[in-house]
Amino acid sequence: MATPEVIVEIAALRKRFGTNEVLKGIDLSVTRGEVIAIIGKSGSGKSTLLRCVNGLEQFQEGTLTVDGQPLLYGNAAAMRALRQRVGMIFQGFNLFPHLSVGRNVMLAPTLVKKKANPDCTEQARKLLERVGLAEKFDAQPEQLSGGQQQRVAIARALAMEPAVLLCDEITSALDPELVGEVLRVVETLADEGMTLLMVTHEMNFARKVADRVVFMHAGRIHEVGPPEQVFGAPQTAELKQFLSALH
């Protein structure tokens, strides 16, 4: 059996904001097609870890490799290449309000990959169809619900054909009735073999979709394992307390 290909490799990663160390030696390997759910209290370092993976935050110690390429802050070309391999979706949808839905999806491939306009248009239509919004190509973002806007943001991230997709609490800004439609799109991506690294408060979703769940506490990974182990047989007092507080 072939060894799974490692897409994200994080080793001994430390990140400080001034004197406050928020990531205290993170080690994590993510293989192609794996879905990782990162859970933990606010302030445990979850979002900061994701922002380190795509180069939005600079870490002070350790190494981080994405799709075989080390993250090199001093090398502008390497950072541009990294950001093409890493898609990221945030809590806020961050769509450009003056551009149509289709143009939002087409923007990065047109500007960054220099794709021809007809190719980008066709790709954008296909991606919007994937997220269930084929009929919204010419709509303006303001005409969409929050759930629809977040699905456009997913399509936009996929337009760069990333090796890994980072999702940072992508349902936390949504009304409860809109959460399901976004999670269904993410579940479909997981089924199709997309490599996903997700910070989430949706525990049932993590239990259902994730291959492994990472529990972070106070800047460290306290536990990592399959959902049935992390949720069903927590090993540390911190995870037990975190899970009991959810009920």
Q: Where are these predicted regions, by residue range?
A:
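C-terminal boundary and immediately downstream tail of ABC-type ATPase nucleotide-binding domains
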Residues: H217-A218, V224, E228-H247
